[in-house]
């Protein structure tokens, strides 16, 4: 019965690591979405560069928009985290956004490395479980219980 207990323990560990991998994958997707938002913001700033005013649709809630005009496109209110936003010129905003993107990419790299570690552990545990199952199957065949 010791082999069965070890097998069950391995299966439990595999399930725990799979759940951990699922959580890491969700975090990876959130960070990738944030990077895409930062890229979209950078593109918007590039599109607005040198223009005094721009027509735009302004969100007013519930998926509704009003046509409006963006004036003074040389200043941007940029979120710096913790619910704090500051006014910056376009170049200052680009610098802040570039730092935010680098931080996000660094976080993504760490998450991907963690995901690889979890995947490697799952692979190792699965190999151990398969080995135990094969031994148990061999023992059952040898005793005629199969």
Curated annotation (Swiss-Prot):
Main location: cytoplasm
Annotated Gene Ontology cellular component terms: cytoplasm; prefoldin complex
Keywords carried by this UniProt record: Chaperone, Cytoplasm
Compartments in which it is found: Cytoplasm
Swiss-Prot/TrEMBL GO biological process terms: protein folding
InterPro entries for this protein: PFD_alpha_archaea, Prefoldin, Prefoldin_subunit_alpha
Molecular function GO terms recorded: unfolded protein binding
NCBIfam families assigned to the protein according to its UniProt record, in alphabetical order: prefoldin subunit alpha (TIGR00293)
Quaternary organization: Heterohexamer of two alpha and four beta subunits.
Protein name, per record: Prefoldin subunit alpha
Organism annotation: Methanobrevibacter smithii (strain ATCC 35061 / DSM 861 / OCM 144 / PS)
